[in-house]
Amino acid sequence: MRKDSLIEDYFEVIDNEHKAYWLGFLMADGCILDMPLSNGTKIPRTVQIMVSLCDIEIIHNFMHDIELDKNIRYDSRVSIHGEKLEYCKVTAGSSKMCNDLIRHGCTQRKSKILKFPVTVPDNLIRHFIRGYFDGDGSVWYCERLQERKDRKNPSIQRNFRSAFQGTSDFLEGVKSNLEANGMTIGNVRKGHGDVSCIEFGARDTMIKFYHYLYDDSTIFLKRKYNKFIETFNYLNMAY
């Protein structure tokens, strides 16, 4: 396999905002691919990121930071509802980068065993969490009519909420850090299979979460950032 030209020791030490962000994103939505050897064993060889085409900025930003110069690959499939889903992906071939990521806890087949990292400095944890949120977190707003027996007319229930998915061990680390910064976070709940989740939505917590993620930040997924701003404005919330 041809070796790619890139900053191979980029993840050797997590010592700035962007490195912490990318470690978080890769833990959520990246993968490490093994290369089989002639003796039947395998070694970690390639880092891969694949995202929806609408989030291609992630690919461009990652390639820029690790100084990777290669073509982005595009693919598509049809969902069970008949909708065409378009993707883009990039791979970075470097055993050194793979092994550094594994040392920080970003392992192969991490969906069942992922733990909150101990190698990210305290002052960079929020950037790490933002990266993970951009990869495997969500923010949404919805409205529905709610009927109550003690009221003549139904009221509108407004839900502005956010959530993370992952292993229960990892999410306990996220929950602990968010609560240490004044947010009210729900308990880690078991989801489908090995996936757990945490969810929260008190208005003061959503405002604190927004500032925790984005204050003085230079890298983030614009789509999720814009969802916060659009919802704050729609609800006339001061933030």
Residue ranges of predicted features:
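Internal intein/HINT superfamily modules and their associated LAGLIDADG
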Residues: 1-239
